């Protein structure tokens, strides 16, 4: 007689598997943080810069249009001004229907500072509301100037009347009064911009050891003793690349001084020659070919242009040189008068 024995259960089948669910803290998305901080506009609301008339204005739309297609990836900071005449009451030069659009942008979006100035003449239709971004009827806008900020001096001339003074390298001076429709915040933006262009940012401080000619931006005012100490401290801590730039700038300055000295020496020789010819025609006079010239420009053959003047520099450049590097869009810029810079 066979007895049935129940099968024994395996030891591993008696284990129970427990599913552990780990909980991670949930963070809001980046857009949610930006909306909370007010850095990005909420859906349905306009960009604060657009509402103030400093972004995506008429000047930006014109330079980004297919007709011009200038700096398509760069942001344009702009405002509308009224050109005035210097006097107690700042009288307007043109009619109220004529305004001046003034803006700054960067030739390359990655630059830490703007390096291009844009000016355009705007003529509004009679009775038209001067809205900056999307006017119902497009006004007549004429691009007047595109200038590197290297060749422009921008000053706050009258903060009470919100007047800027603009001087170009051709000594053309404009007095521009911020349009009354712009709020006071916009003028504070221009004050901040002028301060940045004059003094630079913490990452784009202007190196006084770098000689950049034809720059109308005034240097920082400081005592002679403090300036000398500052330059000496910077010279001690210069890196190899900065030392090379410093030597190049110093050598160019010394070369210019030597050229002026040689010209003065030639002038003295010529005056003596004329005096001797008048007194006696028999005496031998030194010829101009024998005039000594101690100027040596061989070192310029290897460095035709400084690191901040090269159009396509090799290798990454320091941020402190990017502003002047981009301002010099070409090694030599020909002006209307025919001079080369």
Curated annotation (Swiss-Prot):
The keyword ATP-binding does not apply. It is found in: Golgi apparatus. Keywords: Golgi apparatus. The keyword Magnesium does not apply. Disruption phenotype: Mutant males are sterile. Spermatozoa from mutant mice showed abnormal head shapes with an abnormal swollen acrosome morphology and impaired acrosome reaction. One of its GO terms (cellular component) is Golgi apparatus. GO terms for biological process: acrosome assembly; acrosome reaction. Expressed in testis (at protein level). It comes from the Eukaryota. InterPro entries: GARIL-like_Rab2B-bd. Disulfide bonds: none annotated. Belongs to the GARIN family. RAB2B effector protein required for accurate acrosome formation and normal male fertility. In complex with RAB2A/RAB2B, seems to suppress excessive vesicle trafficking during acrosome formation. This is Golgi-associated RAB2 interactor protein 1B. It comes from Mus musculus (Mouse).
């Amino acid at each position: 007689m066979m007895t049935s024995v129940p099968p024994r259960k395996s030891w591993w089948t008696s284990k129970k598997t427990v599913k552990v669910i780990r909980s991670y803290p949930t963070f809001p998305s980046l857009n949610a943080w930006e909306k909370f901080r007010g850095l990005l506009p909420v859906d349905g609301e306009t960009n604060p810069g657009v509402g103030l008339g400093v972004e995506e204005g008429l000047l930006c739309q014109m330079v980004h249009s297919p007709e011009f297609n200038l700096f398509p990836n760069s942001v344009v900071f702009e405002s509308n001004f009224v050109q005035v005449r210097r006097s107690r009451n700042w009288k307007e030069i043109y009619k109220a229907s004529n305004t001046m659009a003034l803006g700054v942008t960067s030739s390359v979006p990655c630059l830490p500072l703007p390096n291009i100035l844009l000016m355009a003449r705007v003529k509004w239709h009679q009775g038209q509301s001067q809205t900056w971004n999307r006017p119902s009827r497009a006004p007549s806008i004429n691009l007047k100037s595109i200038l590197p900020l290297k060749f422009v001096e921008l000053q706050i001339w009258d903060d009470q009347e919100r007047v800027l003074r603009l001087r170009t390298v051709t000594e053309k001076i404009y007095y521009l009064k911020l349009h009354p429709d712009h709020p006071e915040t916009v003028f504070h933006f221009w004050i901040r911009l002028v301060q940045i262009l004059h003094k630079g940012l913490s990452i784009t401080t202007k190196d006084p050891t770098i000689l950049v000619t034809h720059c109308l931006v005034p240097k920082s005012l400081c005592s002679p003793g403090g300036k000398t100490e500052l330059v000496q401290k910077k010279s001690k801590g210069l890196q190899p690349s900065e030392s090379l730039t410093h030597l190049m700038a110093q050598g160019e300055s010394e070369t210019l001084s030597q050229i002026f000295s040689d010209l003065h020496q030639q002038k003295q020789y010529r005056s003596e020659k004329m005096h001797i010819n008048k007194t006696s025609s028999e005496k031998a006079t030194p010829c101009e070919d024998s005039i000594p010239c101690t100027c040596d420009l061989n070192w310029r053959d290897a460095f035709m242009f400084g690191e901040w003047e090269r159009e396509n520099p090799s290798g990454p450049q320091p941020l402190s040189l990017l502003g002047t590097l981009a301002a010099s869009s070409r090694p030599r810029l020909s002006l209307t008068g025919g001079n080369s810079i």
